[in-house]
Amino acid sequence: MPQLKSKIVYLCSACGNDHPKWYGQCPSCNEWGTLGEFKVSKKRKKGNSGLARDSRKLSDILQGEEVKRIPTGIAEMDRVLGGGLLPGSLILLGGNPGIGKSTLALQILPAFTKPVLYVSAEESEEQIGLRARRLNVNSDTLHLSSENRIEGILDQVSLIQPELVVIDSIQTVFSDALDSLPGSVSQIRECGQQLLQLAKQRNIAVIIIGHLTKEGIIAGPKMLEHMVDVVLYIEGDDRHDHRILRSAKNRFGTSNEVGIFKMESNGLIEVKNPSELFLAERRDDISGSTIFPSLEGSRPILVEVQALVSNANFGTPQRNVNGFDFKRLAMLLAVLEKRLGILMGTQDVFVNLVGGLKIDDPAADLAVITAVASSARDKLLPKSVILIGEVGLGGEVRSVSRLDTRINEAKALGFKSVIAPTANVKRMKTQPKGIKISGVTNVGEAFHLLF
């Protein structure tokens, strides 16, 4: 039989699409300098392998029984997933090295009564066992494997018939059908497609663990994130022991949901009331401190906003921000100068969201601008007040979403007063008892109530 020749294609490292010739700019994603040469062995065409799968009427599907989710045994994980793992779903779990991806994946496995398969191409079975012992993970249904060939993994799935498969990690798995190294764009794309077929055809849940690049995105083609049903990120840093599990994409639930965990020696521990965690060490005797109820998905979390304003002694004033958008802070400082006459041109400004949280909710504007003004004037704010509102360029305080949810969280933690946009307050049918709600139309009115 004559030897089959290889075909040359050019694969984009950004989007994963291939092209018959080289371009300086990828025609699919418009990224520059991302196409690389790749050899693909030509395969003989096969005849028709069978009839296509029959289609189904939507009405028949809706009349059938609702697909039941599988609880993971961890309430915070179930919250982010939308109620548990859905059979047939492909889930991508990403995060920095050492953040807790493998730990979380191992901790959910004892909740399954049917067989589960944990594949770690980075560790041996004995090493996985040591980790499981430290986490107190013990289950007769848990099967461990260090296989790194996708073909071998599929054979093990056929043998074990698991309810859940965990792949740790997608960057270390490869296919014999390709000549490229594990972790390359082509290998990740091929293995991802085979795992997607595995999940859909066998109706089992598959969790893929992925590493992040230095830019903070999952290593490999962007197509991988489009391919999967759910994309989860674990966020955190070495300076704090809490971890945030966030859903960036969820076809079967709400995106941007978060679960809060605390990293301890025996694994990730759920935090039932994250607001208390982030406010536990707040000081009441300093200026520049405000409280803002952030919405993370459907969950309200009270966050302390700290600001420090001091004279600039080294020429150009500094603007340092932690957890808040730098450009948005610059806009708020301009509003302070133009609309309220508080000069910031010769002041260093530092803004910090306590606990390492990162917030992009515009409703935090009023809390941030008030914290800066409090520090600039060195005046204390009432300790039991909550600030909510988006600030416009004219200094107006604009309405925000789901004010009632934010207020209920503040009331539950003992706060007595809320300053919110007048437009939101007027739309409230009933005001909750035990907490005073003051409506403001601009930042000046809020300052008049506070200072």
Annotated model-derived regions:
Residues 116-120:
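Conserved RecA-like ASCE P-loop NTPase motor core of nucleic-acid helicases/translocases
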Residues 4-14, 18-81, 86-92, 99-115, ...:
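Peripheral, non-AAA+ core regions of ATP-driven protein-machinery
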Residues 143-145:
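Conserved SAM-binding strand-loop segment of SAM-dependent methyltransferases
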Residues 124:
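Conserved Rossmann-like nucleotide-cofactor binding loop
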Residues 96, 121:
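P-loop (Walker A) phosphate-binding loop of NTP-binding proteins
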